[in-house]
Amino acid sequence: MTPLYLQDVTLRDGMHAIAHRYTVDQVRTIAAALDAAGIAAIEVAHGDGLAGSSVNYGHGAASDAEWIAAAAEVLTTARLTTLLVPGIGTIADLKAARALGVTSVRIATHCTEADISAQHIGWARENGMDVSGFLMMAHMNDPVDLAAQAKLMESYGAHCVYVTDSGGRLLMSDVAERIDAYRQVLEPETQIGIHAHHNLSLGVANSVVAVEHGRILGDGPLGTPVGRTVRVDASLAGQGAGAGNAPLEVFVAVAELHGWEHGCDVFALMDAAEDVVRPLQDRPVRVDRETLSLGYAGVYSSFLRHAERAAERYGVDVRSILVELGRRQMVGGQEDMIVDVALDLAGKEET
């Protein structure tokens, strides 16, 4: 089987879990531990990507440049990567990151808006970067239409396109259908990626399904030993928005049991998760009534802490806020609507 490409997101998606408050020294320590453990790629940025530090998304404890430079100092084998959301980050931000040593980038859009990634993907490809398309909130688009969006990203120059389960809402069958749809339209050399969240406790299971279906070329049956590279996102101790991402150390252990080539030291990952990352969590990254509600309602995982603050301020149940956000089909970038929803619910309770 073609080796897996494991990308750690502790230092990007994991920012959401601690309100973007990693210090430069913590970034350096975590990046060094991941590099030593053999991870292929390490993503570094504000939780909402380059230039995400703001009133709307939350201010970072340091700048993207400071975090990226800290990681670059300690990496010896891992690829330094970042993420950019068009409309938040710009090509100028990407140029600055590249100058600091970033060689790979994911361009992230809502699952129906691939067309806004054309300029950014094109620039990255033309300038020698590894570049992926990152179709967020993948549960909000059916498999065929999502695959059509992936094909657009491929046409702009993406080396890989992800099924991005930002809400942790996809079931295993949903992942299989979307990965299979990608296989039908993408060229054999284009890689397929999975970015799972653990809100329904399916982060690892969904990643396994993505590997099983994504590594096949064309219409071969499951188990066909021919391969396309599958990229899998995960994070130490699951550090990420909502109930977190697929826990890296758990996924690697499962990959080992499957006999998949991954290149990582599972014990070193366990140690980094337990000794370095988990002590940083001011709110446990786990499935609980609030994070389960994210997956149940299909809500953008990074809404969690915003919703918890609004619930406390206006005296409403955070689950009610999350379910209503899901009903209204709010997506990333609409964080300002969380307070509106909380006020609406508080008003109804008073009448």
Curated annotation (Swiss-Prot):
Residues 4-258 form the Pyruvate carboxyltransferase domain. The keyword Repressor does not apply. The keyword Manganese applies. The record marks R12 as: Transition state stabilizer. GO terms for molecular function: 2-isopropylmalate synthase activity; 4-hydroxy-2-oxovalerate aldolase activity; manganese ion binding. Its EC number is 4.1.3.39. The active site is at H16. It comes from the Bacteria. HAMAP family: HOA. This is 4-hydroxy-2-oxovalerate aldolase. It comes from Salinispora tropica (strain ATCC BAA-916 / DSM 44818 / JCM 13857 / NBRC 105044 / CNB-440).
